[in-house]
UniProtKB/Swiss-Prot annotation:
Entry similarity comment: Belongs to the dihydrofolate reductase family.
Described purpose of this protein according to its UniProt entry: Key enzyme in folate metabolism. Catalyzes an essential reaction for de novo glycine and purine synthesis, and for DNA precursor synthesis.
Annotated protein name in UniProt: Viral dihydrofolate reductase
Alphabetical keyword list: NADP, One-carbon metabolism, Oxidoreductase
Pathway(s) annotated for this protein in UniProt: Cofactor biosynthesis; tetrahydrofolate biosynthesis; 5,6,7,8-tetrahydrofolate from 7,8-dihydrofolate: step 1/1
Enzyme class (EC, first level): oxidoreductase
PANTHER family hit by this protein: DIHYDROFOLATE REDUCTASE
GO biological process, one term: one-carbon metabolic process
Length: 186
């Protein structure tokens, strides 16, 4: 099975994605709806798989775990048991991708979405696979302590248009942002 990986992330002007385990900007409702739509839209009788690190999992409010209508897989080298509410646990992205190649997953999983954090994004971007990056580019700086890896434009081609991705600049709560899509081919 040829694996199509997607990363979805919101970044500020300095590629910051988090502060103390949380988003450093106020909730942007349209970006949140975009995240939900992109990560839940799947073909009939299948669900998308969301892969996240342990810290990302625990940053999701407990009442919202697991992310509904998606198969939730948590990555951790330290956890011995699947966190309450998660569906699967793997030690690495590589282990997770091997797991979903098993026959019982092939018929259940449509798309794979990497949703954080920083080290999981880095692993995905270095993985030898076709990859799309869905980036919400916030057009200002925030105080951050966690960053998304630099996007190497020699490897990643920006897509001018992509179905279902608004191309116009958005604004909420005085914060301007735009949706971008990049594609890496292997």
């Amino acid at each position: 099975m040829v694996l199509l990986l997607n990363c979805i992330v919101a970044v500020d002007q300095n590629m910051g994605i988090g502060k103390n385990g949380y988003l450093p900007w106020p909730l942007l409702t349209n970006d949140f709806k975009y995240f939900q739509r992109m990560t839940t839209s799947s073909v009939k009788n299948k669900q998308n798989l969301v892969i996240m690190g342990k810290n990302t999992w625990f940053s999701i409010p407990e009442k919202n775990r697991p992310l509904k209508d998606r198969i939730n897989l948590v990555l951790s080298k330290k956890l011995k048991e699947i966190p309450h509410g998660a569906h699967f646990l793997a030690r690495s992205l590589n282990d997770a991708l091997k797991l979903i190649e098993q026959p019982e997953f092939v018929n259940k999983v449509d798309m794979v979405w990497i949703i954080g954090g920083s080290s999981v994004y880095k692993d995905a971007m270095n993985y030898s696979s076709h990859l799309k990056l869905f980036v919400t580019r916030i057009m200002q700086s925030f105080e951050t302590d966690t960053f998304f890896p630099e996007i190497d434009l020699k490897k990643y081609k920006p897509l001018i248009e992509y179905p279902g991705v608004p191309s116009n600049t958005q604004e909420e709560k005085g914060i301007r942002y735009k949706f971008e899509v990049y594609e890496k081919n292997y």
